[in-house]
Amino acid sequence: MADDNGFLKGPITRLFEKVARWIGLSINAGPVLAALFMESYDTGNRMCSDDICKATGYSRANAGLIISQLEALGVVEGRRDYDQTGRGRKRVLYAIDGTFGDIFNLGVMSLLDRLGAMMKDIQSIDDLRSGREDSLVPMLNDIRKVIQGRIESLEAVSSAEITR
C-alpha cells in the first residue's frame, strides 16, 4: 500500500480512529482500518499482516490482536494465500468485509444493545418494586420514555440509507 502523501499519519487516520471508537474498539484499530480501506479503494487487493505492520508501524502481535478483534466483529475477512509458493503455513490476506455503511451500523447496533440493556434494568426495578407507588414511578417513566425514543430513532437511522 502506498503512503506517498502521509495519509496514515494525518486526517484519514484520525477519521478511522473515530470509526474504531464508534464500533467499540480502541483508537489503535484506526490505522489498521485506514490501511485496509485505503488498500481496498486504491488497488482492490488484500493485505498480509506484514503489510499491515509496515503501513501502521505496529508490531506483529499488536496488529494480530487488532485484526482478530476486527474479524470477530465481522469487519475484516482473512483468506489463506494459496498462490504463495513454498513449504509451511500459507499467509493470510486480509480485506474489509462489507461497506462503510455496514461498519457504521455496527456502532448503531451497539448503541441499541446498550439501550435495550437499560430497558431491561428498568423492567427489573419495576418487577422488584411489585407495583408500589413511590417517587421512583415518575423518574422511571421519564427514563423509559427517553430510552424508548432513542431506540426508535436509532432503529430508523440503521434502516435508512445515508445520502449525504
Model-derived features with residue positions:
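Short alpha-helical segments that sit at the start of domains
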Residues: 3-32
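Short helix->loop/beta-hairpin flanking segments within DNA-binding domains
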Residues: 25-45
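Amphipathic alpha-helical dimerization/coiled-coil segments
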Residues: 101-146
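A short, conserved structural fragment
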Residues: 71-82
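A short alpha-helical element within helix-turn-helix/winged-helix DNA-binding domains
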Residues: 45-56
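Helix-turn-helix DNA-binding helix
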Residues: 63, 67-70
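Short, cationic-aromatic polyanion-contact patches
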Residues: 25-28, 48, 81-106
